Design a protein with these regions (language model features):
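Charge-dense, helix-prone N-terminal extensions
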Residues: 1-109
Length: 109
């Protein structure tokens, strides 16, 4: 599967999560939602932001299962992937809010 097809399929699986975009960067694709970066696609791998402020690779077995043809997809695999992505996005969003709130607080001192 070529990179464009892979990214397209990942975005299709993420379609229940509105406003997810993929933007090409140096050597990888960056995943954003509402202007917040929460993931990366490098070659055929999806990496999501973790609690440790690092991008952790989603299990290759799960990625392989969500890339199956539609008539062979198990909805629980799509749901598991969406859960991981949503968790990563909320984590990234909370970090941005914390940084901006702290900056705003410091500017008002």
């Amino acid at each position: 599967m070529i990179q464009e097809e892979f990214v397209s399929k990942i975005l299709e699986v993420l379609s229940p999560m509105p406003d997810v975009t993929a933007i090409k960067s140096k050597g990888h694709i960056v995943l954003y939602k509402d202007g917040v970066m929460f993931g990366k696609i490098i070659e055929q791998n999806v990496l999501l932001l973790s609690n440790g402020n690092k991008f952790i690779e989603v299990e290759s077995e799960l990625i392989a299962r969500i890339l199956r043809p539609k008539n062979q997809l198990d909805q629980s695999d799509c749901d598991a992937f969406l859960f991981k992505v949503t968790k990563s996005w909320w984590l990234a969003k909370s970090k941005i809010w914390t940084i901006s709130a702290t900056k705003g607080f410091l500017e008002n001192i």
